[in-house]
Amino acid sequence: PYFPPTRMKEEIKSNFDKLLTEYPSGMHVNSLLASKYFDVKQEYICVGNGAAELIKALMELFSGKIGVVYPTFEEYPNRKTTDDIVAYIPDNNDFTYSVDDLIHYFDHKQLSSLLLINPDNPSGNFIPFNQLLRLLEWSKAQQIALVVDESFVDFTDDSEKNTLLKNELLASYPQLVVVKSISKSYGVPGLRLGVLASSNEQLITTIKKDVSIWNINSFAEFYMQIFGKYEADYRNACQKFMIERSRFFNLLQEISFLRVIPSQA
């Protein structure tokens, strides 16, 4: 409810006729726009028609066993067969889990990839950056592709420290694939935008070739062109959301028959 601001929506409206009647630029320009906003190398990032398009392309490229933490966002496991999935279900009432839990469970499961939604959807469980580094080291040593969906990371405390969209980090862990929806925290699900990043440039190139030539429409492209100007508004909106989340959490705790699970999503 706090983003995008009225000024941003008015800017999009004022360009409606032009955006409606012109073709979008295509993947090269869209990747450049995303790389500038997220400060990630253009060779490391691609843009999708929502994260769902990128998830589909990514899952189709992966073979072998994939580790999945349940409950989860079903778009990922829906792209694989049941035989391909090694499921981990937390054995507690709060659906919480740690890096140690994941490593202990998946260590000898002969995975080719591991999916982590962080913060988790739908449980809201969150593994902080300093702990996540151990999972990155483990997956690198095991030669397991680690897919981290951080679509809700901007809702976390110290969110700028928690994102994995960093050139140095991506370069150090070529097995890491980061997926981020530009819908949830940005408040624009109708535009259908998402990004996928990895220093595995062969993977990025393959996905870019897999999606359609104009997978992002002109309105979504224009949004990426201008949203850097509204960065302060966006950060302020996220802070307002976190305050409201805390208020709502406290109100729910006052209801005697509810067991309220903490969330960073």
What are these regions (language model features)?
Residues 1, 51, 73, 118-122, ...:
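Short glycine-rich anion-binding loops that position phosphate/pyrophosphate groups of nucleotides
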Residues 1-50:
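N-terminal small-domain helix-loop-helix segment of the aminotransferase-like
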Residues 53, 60-116:
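PLP-dependent aminotransferase-like
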Residues 97-107, 122-185:
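Active-site pre-lysine segment of PLP-dependent enzymes
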